[in-house]
Amino acid sequence: MSFIVEKINCNSLPLKRKTRFAAGHDVYTPYDVVFEVGQTEAKVYTNLVVKSVPEGCAIIVAGRSGLMHGNGMRAIDDEITVGSEDELIITLTRKTGLDKRVVLKSETRVAQIIADTTQDVKLVELPISTYGLDVNHGDVPVYKFNTHWRLEAMPWLRDYQGNRNEVYLRLKSEHFNGIIDPDYKGDIIYMSETPFERLDELYVEVRQFSGETYLGGESPDNVVRGEGGFGSTGGH
């Protein structure tokens, strides 16, 4: 999965492993990053980086040892360019002990940022109806893919065919588990830069314009539902 970096420091690109950024840089993550009391390190694994780095923290760019390419194991290059197919990990290191909980709030415009920085990919629609599955509300269908495709967050995706949901994708291990909300009427649009070269898990996050959020990777009790939404509970 490409780790797209924006608004860190243009002069620092291409990023090198172990590159450090001081506290205060304006960077993004598609989900909240939490420092618990006493915690000195936090990692961010997905498309963008970290917003509002706390005073006294440093950001370290590192490579991931197990990438979803071929057999799943590949060392990353010494230099990482924006748009490369390497997933980077941003490590937030707290230089001193914490005396309070710190939450780095996520950036919600991930789709638009990806659209601005991604090239040579295409949009793929995956409506539920194409799977041929007999799925009832509350069931946990397993969607598996073994095809090679990429897709991009197109600039017009936010209004695509009247669908008011924004869907983000993260790549995990071997399958995607989802619970279908019976009120959902639109297509589920998966967005990724990663070629699916083997059975991989789709980890989906859906945000509605009205503000409701559906998060993959949470238990059904933690899924927030809203009218016309799709709740997913991706397995780990």
From Swiss-Prot:
One Pfam family of this chain: dUTPase
Compositional bias of kind Gly residues: 226-236
Gene3D superfamilies in UniProt: 2.70.40.10
Membrane-spanning parts: none
Region (Disordered) residue spans: 217-236
InterPro entries hit by this protein: dUTPase-like, dUTPase-like_sf
Protein name from the UniProt record: Uncharacterized protein ORF75
